[in-house]
Amino acid sequence: MMKVLVVVALLVTLISYSSSEGIDDLEADELLSLMANEQTRKECISKHHECTSNKHGCCRGNFFKYKCQCTTVVTQDGEQTERCFCGTPPHHKAAELVVGFGKKIFG
């Protein structure tokens, strides 16, 4: 039963990884076409660093590309601003946990 769960988790991880690659490629193509006249793309943004001004510029992690995650922050003046950082979405964290667990079991 455990082997079946590990195999299913690996399949879900592979499908998620391949779909994430396809979506990232589409987003990158759209972004590049919009930025054709602007300066060349800057280096990617590391995990936990701010991506408010470049939401598609996050680096790749071990298995997946980090996603720019945003939240609304209210300052002491009562002004609302959006702050974003590159991070790993929960479903990607779960997939990485399953793969790590599988590596420990199967060596």
Swiss-Prot record:
<feature type="disulfide bond">
    <location>
        <begin position="70"/>
        <end position="84"/>
    </location>
</feature>
<feature type="signal peptide">
    <location>
        <begin position="1"/>
        <end position="20"/>
    </location>
</feature>
<dbReference type="InterPro" id="IPR011142">
    <property type="entry name" value="Spider_toxin_CSTX_Knottin_CS"/>
</dbReference>
<protein>
    <recommendedName>
        <fullName>U1-lycotoxin-Ls1i</fullName>
    </recommendedName>
</protein>
<keyword id="KW-0732">Signal</keyword>
<keyword id="KW-1015">Disulfide bond</keyword>
<feature type="disulfide bond">
    <location>
        <begin position="58"/>
        <end position="86"/>
    </location>
</feature>
<dbReference type="GO" id="GO:0005576">
    <property type="term" value="C:extracellular region"/>
</dbReference>
<keyword id="KW-0964">Secreted</keyword>
<feature type="disulfide bond">
    <location>
        <begin position="51"/>
        <end position="68"/>
    </location>
</feature>
<comment type="similarity">
    <text>Belongs to the neurotoxin 19 (CSTX) family. 04 (U1-Lctx) subfamily.</text>
</comment>
<dbReference type="Pfam" id="PF10530">
    <property type="entry name" value="Toxin_35"/>
</dbReference>
<feature type="disulfide bond">
    <location>
        <begin position="44"/>
        <end position="59"/>
    </location>
</feature>
<feature type="propeptide">
    <location>
        <begin position="21"/>
        <end position="41"/>
    </location>
</feature>
<dbReference type="InterPro" id="IPR019553">
    <property type="entry name" value="Spider_toxin_CSTX_knottin"/>
</dbReference>
<keyword id="KW-0800">Toxin</keyword>
<dbReference type="GO" id="GO:0090729">
    <property type="term" value="F:toxin activity"/>
</dbReference>
<keyword id="KW-0960">Knottin</keyword>
